């Protein structure tokens, strides 16, 4: 007998070699599985994540599930137990007991990624692991206009890094917002879509920054999408600025205001 738990977690990705388990590397999955192994006196419990964030990528709303053997532990006790065993760069924020049909990855209806770009002239030592960096002039209005060309259902081959294992490159982008955070002197990009290819968000950010800086025409993304060629966007924004912000398991929720608040 097992009980399936769905848990939402946040982590600072700076000191992790990504989410996915890797031999002899510190990973998010490995850290959680080690804790569960201690709780079950040596049994390996496989943790399934909503996505495999890369080294240096952060999460505000990563979702996992696992099947815990034996007597059911109430959700409020499970979250307390796991949080007591986590390092300071991981925290669980929610725990639910779900039926066996739920899957953290395959039940997804959409994902929300946020990317932060520091505009400081020099790299801020206190931001270097938590933002990308771009010190050149940017026209936010041009980037906002260009982002409209990403909306809808497209083949995003031009925005997929090599190394991805998924052959179907068609995805739907529901929402893009680009805004200046005056207080932090940052540009904040929000993307919500049915799913995202390997490094897709970071490549889209790199292309939009080139448009904002005048290196590309405003509507160049139409041509890039049609080309279906990764060589059309050779740059990839740094991992440090990317956050997995929210995972949707019901239909896409449109109640998102311009500050990027999900209600």
Swiss-Prot record:
Active site: residue positions: 54 (nucleophile)
Catalytic class of the enzyme: isomerase
Positions in coiled-coil regions: none
EC numbers: 5.4.99.12
Sites where the protein binds substrate: 113
Pfam families reported for this sequence: PseudoU_synth_1
Any one GO biological process: tRNA pseudouridine synthesis
Subunit structure: Homodimer.
Function as written in the Swiss-Prot or TrEMBL entry: Formation of pseudouridine at positions 38, 39 and 40 in the anticodon stem and loop of transfer RNAs.
HAMAP family from the UniProt entry: TruA
Stated name of the protein: tRNA pseudouridine synthase A
């Amino acid at each position: 007998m097992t009980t399936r738990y769905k848990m939402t977690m946040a982590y600072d990705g700076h000191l992790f070699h990504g989410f996915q388990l890797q031999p002899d590397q510190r990973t998010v999955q490995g850290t959680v599985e080690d804790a569960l192994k201690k709780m079950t006196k040596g049994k390996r419990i496989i943790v399934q994540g909503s996505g495999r964030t890369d080294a240096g990528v952060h999460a505000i709303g990563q979702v996992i599930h696992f099947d815990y053997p034996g007597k059911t532990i109430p959700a409020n006790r499970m979250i307390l137990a796991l949080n007591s065993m986590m390092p300071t760069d991981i925290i669980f924020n929610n725990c639910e007991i779900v039926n066996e049909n739920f899957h953290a990855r395959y039940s997804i209806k959409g994902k929300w990624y946020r990317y932060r770009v520091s505009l400081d002239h020099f790299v801020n030592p206190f931001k270097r692991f938590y933002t990308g960096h771009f010190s050149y002039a940017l026209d936010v209005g041009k980037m906002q206009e260009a982002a409209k060309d990403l909306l809808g259902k497209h083949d995003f081959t031009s925005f997929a890094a090599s190394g991805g294992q998924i052959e179907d490159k068609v995805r739907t982008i529901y929402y893009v917002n680009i805004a200046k955070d005056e207080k932090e002197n940052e540009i904040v990009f929000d993307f919500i879509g049915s799913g995202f290819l390997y490094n897709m968000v970071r490549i889209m950010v790199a292309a939009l920054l080139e448009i904002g800086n005048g290196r590309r025409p405003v509507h160049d993304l139409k041509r890039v999408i049609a080309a279906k060629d990764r060589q059309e966007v050779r740059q990839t924004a740094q991992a440090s600025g990317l956050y997995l912000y929210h995972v949707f398991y019901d239909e896409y929720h449109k109640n998102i205001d311009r500050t990027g608040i999900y209600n």
